[in-house]
């Protein structure tokens, strides 16, 4: 359990290894400057002031985040940032500036901003404010005492979000109401001490994500159903369900204890039989049977309680589904407010008419301008075929004039144009050797072949 004496012995800071910048060990001149005190006013030398503040303020917050703490004290920071036996002389000014900017907040001020009556009688340390702190605040002294606890606002919000996710992912989230002691056990690793745990609950309470109530001397916590939902006050249904859950746990523990007792009686009867003590063995067996009957009765009660809880959980699920359906119907009605079948049909007809008009315009534009000339497509196709046939014909080699003057009908009659005849005559006239007498007369060779009669 936490106590002020134990907390005073253990610093909240610790070793800041791994967080220190390179100049911490390499630049003696700069570190001497950073460890020196601030001037009385920033106006004296704003450059030096901003340089020191830009170094220490992020380092203090990052050190706290690395250590997983949300509560700071000047004394702990001075011990954590010692260097070669020297402590930073300007840390108090740094904390004052962080307080002014709202990144830090006095623990007492934070508690005053939230309804913390549920812990005022349980954790009295929150009400212990030394007289010198109260007097300094009344007199307007902004100096930070070495023992005063400050809260890192952003780190506390992050820790509260972590605890909320931890609860949501645990079996405790089956019902929004949970015992404070069970929640404290669940958050033991996230919250290093009891004061941090209570500060986290206060932050969640400030965000309206939890509410705390004392019931029969025991504190219970109710969580909001969703991450963005607001928690509702604890009602009779919540208390009834919580009592049923406590009864279930109590009956389960009792059944487990009686089961162990029945097993013990069975072992005693076995040992008595081995020792020949028949009467003792019979008494042990009778005790075992009585215990088993009690277990059966407790099982019946436990089944009843669990059945009621199952029905409650089912009804809560049904209520959630009903609310979702109701919200969906409302949204659908709102979205279909101005939509009717007649309007939909009219809209479709307009779209079809516009599409038809667009098709007609496209066809008209695709027709082009003919300049008043109409062409027959079939005649154009025939003429194109004739041109293709002429271009695909290869030139034929003329055969030698046969010696036999009797020609058959199978010999083709080649057609020779006038231009070809003129070219052939020109070649003959320019020949050097002239014509060789032969039975093949060029003139006859060039003449069209006649069919014999």
Curated annotation (Swiss-Prot):
Family label: Belongs to the SNF7 family.
Sites bearing Phosphoserine, chain numbering: 232, 410, 417, 431, 441
PANTHER family listed in its UniProt record: CHARGED MULTIVESICULAR BODY PROTEIN, CHARGED MULTIVESICULAR BODY PROTEIN 7
Family matches, as Gene3D superfamilies: 6.10.250.1710, ESAT-6-like
Subunit: Interacts with CHMP4B, but not with VPS25. Interacts with LEMD2 (via C-terminus).
Parts forming coiled coils: 243-312
GO cellular component annotations of the record: amphisome membrane; autophagosome membrane; chromatin; cytoplasmic side of plasma membrane; cytosol; ESCRT III complex; kinetochore; kinetochore microtubule
UniProt feature, compositional bias: Low complexity: 10-22
Biased composition, class Basic and acidic residues, residue ranges: 392-403
Role description: ESCRT-III-like protein required to recruit the ESCRT-III complex to the nuclear envelope (NE) during late anaphase. Together with SPAST, the ESCRT-III complex promotes NE sealing and mitotic spindle disassembly during late anaphase. Recruited to the reforming NE during anaphase by LEMD2. Plays a role in the endosomal sorting pathway.
An annotated GO BP: plasma membrane repair
InterPro entries: Snf7_fam (IPR005024)
Swiss-Prot/TrEMBL keywords: Coiled coil, Cytoplasm, Nucleus, Phosphoprotein, Protein transport, Transport
Residues bearing PTM Phosphothreonine: 408
Disordered: annotated segments: 1-22, 392-417, 431-453
Lineage: Eukaryota, Metazoa, Chordata, Craniata, Vertebrata
Keyword Lipid biosynthesis: no
Keyword Signal: no
Name listed for the protein in its UniProt record: Charged multivesicular body protein 7
Organism: Homo sapiens
Location in the cell: Cytoplasm; Nucleus envelope
